[in-house]
């Protein structure tokens, strides 16, 4: 007995489109990013975060420190706030200390203490004065704090037994920090713009 297969049962793959507006692969990428805990990708999306809603302004000092990045970043934030946007500044320090509390003030400057007790960089005092806004621990982080949180998550099994690496896990925690701040905003509304100042040198 011959079993015939009709030509219509075989589908030929659709060739890739040259149209830049074709979104054939965007759904696949989106679903992969959101299911990141089950793949080698890790790009956490915190509650309240809306993709495409928040904008980011990054302020770097390249190979020099003490250029006035804090004044510049807070001035940009003030101008945006005066235009009616909700802004959320964050200072990201490259050092491995958990916070600024134990740093030598002669080398680093005076420590600024936020209302919630966070010991941080003086630039956060500039942000608070310029924006007339009380900041929290969400507005300050260091490499040491990020590494500490990565290791704590690994000990709790949050990475599902995978080998923890710089990419995607450490970079994923940086994304988490920025996205959580974007969702939190000024404490009342989510941020339209997140101002990211990267301290020190890159």
Describe each PLM feature range.
Residues 1-202:
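Flexible phosphate-sensing "switch/lid" loops adjacent to ATP/NTP-binding sites
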């Amino acid at each position: 007995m011959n079993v015939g297969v009709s030509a219509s049962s075989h589908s030929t793959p659709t060739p890739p489109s040259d149209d830049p507006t074709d979104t054939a692969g965007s759904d696949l990428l989106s679903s992969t990013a959101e299911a990141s805990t089950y793949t080698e990708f890790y790009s956490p999306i915190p509650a309240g975060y809306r993709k495409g809603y928040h904008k980011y302004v990054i302020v770097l000092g390249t190979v020099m420190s003490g250029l006035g990045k804090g004044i510049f970043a807070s001035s940009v934030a003030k101008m945006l706030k005066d235009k009616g946007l909700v802004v959320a500044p964050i200072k990201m320090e490259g050092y491995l200390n958990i916070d600024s509390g134990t740093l030598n003030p002669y080398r680093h400057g005076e420590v600024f203490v936020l209302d919630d007790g966070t010991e941080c960089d003086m630039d956060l005092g500039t942000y608070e004065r310029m924006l007339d806004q009380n900041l929290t621990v969400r507005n300050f982080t260091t490499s040491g704090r990020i590494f500490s949180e990565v290791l704590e998550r690994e000990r709790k099994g949050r990475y599902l037994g995978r080998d923890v690496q710089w990419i995607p896990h450490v970079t994923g925690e940086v994304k988490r920090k920025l996205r959580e701040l974007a969702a939190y905003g000024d404490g009342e509304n989510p941020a339209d713009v997140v101002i990211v100042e990267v301290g020190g040198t890159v």
